UniProtKB/Swiss-Prot annotation:
<dbReference type="GO" id="GO:0003883">
    <property type="term" value="F:CTP synthase activity"/>
</dbReference>
<feature type="binding site">
    <location>
        <begin position="379"/>
        <end position="382"/>
    </location>
    <ligand>
        <name>L-glutamine</name>
    </ligand>
</feature>
<dbReference type="GO" id="GO:0042802">
    <property type="term" value="F:identical protein binding"/>
</dbReference>
<keyword id="KW-0067">ATP-binding</keyword>
<dbReference type="InterPro" id="IPR029062">
    <property type="entry name" value="Class_I_gatase-like"/>
</dbReference>
<feature type="binding site">
    <location>
        <position position="222"/>
    </location>
    <ligand>
        <name>UTP</name>
    </ligand>
</feature>
<dbReference type="GO" id="GO:0005829">
    <property type="term" value="C:cytosol"/>
</dbReference>
<dbReference type="GO" id="GO:0005524">
    <property type="term" value="F:ATP binding"/>
</dbReference>
<keyword id="KW-0436">Ligase</keyword>
<feature type="active site" description="Nucleophile; for glutamine hydrolysis">
    <location>
        <position position="378"/>
    </location>
</feature>
<comment type="similarity">
    <text>Belongs to the CTP synthase family.</text>
</comment>
<protein>
    <recommendedName>
        <fullName>CTP synthase</fullName>
        <ecNumber>6.3.4.2</ecNumber>
    </recommendedName>
</protein>
<feature type="active site">
    <location>
        <position position="516"/>
    </location>
</feature>
<feature type="binding site">
    <location>
        <position position="469"/>
    </location>
    <ligand>
        <name>L-glutamine</name>
    </ligand>
</feature>
<dbReference type="Pfam" id="PF00117">
    <property type="entry name" value="GATase"/>
</dbReference>
<dbReference type="GO" id="GO:0004359">
    <property type="term" value="F:glutaminase activity"/>
</dbReference>
<dbReference type="InterPro" id="IPR017456">
    <property type="entry name" value="CTP_synthase_N"/>
</dbReference>
Length: 543
């Protein structure tokens, strides 16, 4: 039977519940247990798909096409379990399902209330998402005390009672601030946070105390005394220079032993040698490159969380320190491509909307004409096609219909019909809702032998995840290929352009899919590794 570890946060937000949860999951997985993770988001949006990147950060896309919280990206990077639609849900999704059932008459005329109807739906989704895992870690978004999270906290209170103490435990993350003028850490915020939890019937079993300074034994003993938590279950988690150290930090304090003993699980010891290798390669690079990342959402780098991590993973795989130079594409528009001088490669990620697009197009032109390694992702591929159409083919008004409906040369247009991974035909129009209407999730892609992208993957057919509603216009493709543009990747049915490469260029690859969603610190990703290798080769030319 599945055991549940519910994870909450207190005092302040952004303590790193997702990282701490994923790190514990990684240790339990290293002990031979089958582990999964869930993220419960208290906001009323049905999913984060239409939320601003400046507010929410990245939308992580699962293999089965769910638009989810960025924490699911952390989960997949730390454990081998692939996340799905069942691993993330919101208040909006819960209410939507309950109201749909009410309209069908499923509740037989009952008055619909938060308790029991909303809490029952939350519990049902938790149990479904956990599946047949040995241990399911369930992270509750937000901070204890927020009004939005109350139904979720009540649901896990009920579920703990229903499954019993031997199958459920609560891990609470808190902040233990260091007061420089006093020269000591303060435990009072943690005490009050636990008091808030206990007032709603939740007693934490584990406290993970975040701080920028070590928390000494006396402070941990004091926290244990005032919170009714075992002293060995008060874990000190101070800031580290790489998040991939955290599994080792938690293991060294015996957190996994405490969990295994509490649940009565029979399993081996934790083999964290893979994580030791990751940390060693991350902290002891032998080479160094500088790569410009030109995007639209540079004010909040969480909008590119998986991509930034994927570049770090590529550095780990190549024993290379990857310095990312973050450049806003609007700055390229206003200040010119001089901002790109001196870099070893250029990366243009995805995005939506007209703002900053011309800066991205200028960036592509600079990379293509100066023979600088280029990787374009999603919109980064679309602007590569637009740039080629304008400056090589000669269609000066070439554009995407997303940005200019009146263009006489719409080389990128709305996908009106495509076949999903299950073989079903999906159809969209300009009048379709924005939410949940994109080409989403894992799709097959056929690669052309002898191409740069084929050299990276070393296979003819790959599977990558998508999140887009615009594609290369096949009606204008013949003129583009006649002018030299190489189409080196197509969708499984051959209908859609997935990868393009520029001719007479050392390394210019642009893909419609999002390879960053499947990159992990232990395995890296072949496309990003190839990109970093190209950057190293470019740097060697300068010497």
């Amino acid at each position: 039977m599945t055991r549940y570890i519910f994870v909450t946060g207190g005092v302040v937000s952004s303590l790193g519940k997702g990282i701490a949860s994923a790190s514990l999951a990684a240790i339990l997985e290293a002990r031979g247990l089958k582990v999964t993770m869930l993220k419960l988001d208290p906001y009323i949006n049905v999913d984060p798909g239409t939320m601003s990147p400046f507010q929410h950060g990245e939308v992580f896309v699962t293999h089965d096409g769910a638009e989810t919280d960025l924490d699911l990206g952390h989960y997949e990077r730390f454990i081998r379990t692939t996340m799905s639609k069942s691993n993330n849900f919101t208040t909006g999704r819960v209410y939507e399902d309950v109201l749909r059932k009410e309209r069908r008459g499923d509740y037989l005329g009952a008055t619909i209330q938060v308790i029991p109807h909303i809490t029952d739906e939350i519990k049902r989704r938790i149990i479904k998402g956990a599946g047949d895992a040995d241990v399911a870690l369930v992270e509750i978004g937000g901070t204890v005390g927020d009004i939005e999270s109350q139904p979720f906290l009540e649901a896990i209170r009920q579920l703990r009672v229903e499954v019993g103490a031997k199958r459920a435990m609560l891990m609470h993350l808190t902040l233990v601030p260091y007061i420089a003028t006093a020269g000591e850490t303060k435990t009072k915020p943690t005490q009050h946070s636990v008091k808030e939890l206990r007032s709603i019937g939740l007693q934490p079993d584990v406290l993970v105390c975040r701080s920028d300074h070590p928390i000494d034994v006396s402070s941990r003993r004091k926290i244990a005394l005032f919170t009714n938590v075992e002293e060995r279950a008060v874990i000190s988690l101070e800031d580290v220079d790489t998040i991939y150290k955290i599994p080792g930090v938690l293991h060294a304090q015996g957190l996994d032993d405490f969990v295994v003993e509490r649940f009565g699980l029979e399993c081996g010891g934790a083999d964290l040698s893979e994580w030791d290798r990751v940390v060693d390669a991350k902290l002891n690079p032998e080479k160094e490159v500088t790569i410009a990342m030109v995007g639209k959402y540079m004010e909040l780098l969480d909008a590119y969380k998986s991509l930034i991590e994927a570049m770090s993973h590529a550095g780990i795989q190549n024993r290379t320190k990857v310095n990312l130079r973050y450049i806003d594409s609007e700055d390229i528009e206003n200040q010119g491509t001089g901002l790109l001088e001196g870099v070893d490669a250029i990366l243009v990620p995805g995005g939506f909307g007209l703002r900053g697009v011309e800066g991205k197009i200028k960036t592509v032109q600079y990379a293509r004409e100066n023979k600088i390694p280029y990787l374009g992702i999603c919109l980064g591929m679309q602007v590569a096609v637009i740039e080629y159409a304008r400056n090589v083919v000669g269609w000066t008004d070439a554009n995407s219909t997303e940005f200019d409906m009146a263009s006489q040369h719409p080389v990128v247009g709305l996908i009106t019909e495509w076949q999903d991974a299950a073989g079903s035909v999906e159809q969209r129009s300009e009048n379709s809702d924005l939410g949940g209407t994109m080409r989403l999730g894992a799709q097959d892609c056929q690669l052309q032998a002898g191409s740069k992208v084929h050299d990276c993957y070393g296979k003819d057919v790959i599977v990558e995840r998508h999140r887009h509603r615009y594609e290369v216009n096949n009606n204008l493709l013949p003129q583009l290929t006649e002018a030299g543009l190489k189409v080196t990747g197509r969708s499984g049915d051959g209908a859609l352009v997935e990868v393009v490469e520029a001719p007479d260029h050392p390394w210019f690859v642009a893909c419609q899919f999002h390879p960053e969603f499947t990159s992990t610190p232990r395995d890296g990703h072949p496309l990003f590794s190839g990109f970093v290798n190209a950057a190293l080769a470019q740097k060697a030319k300068k010497v």
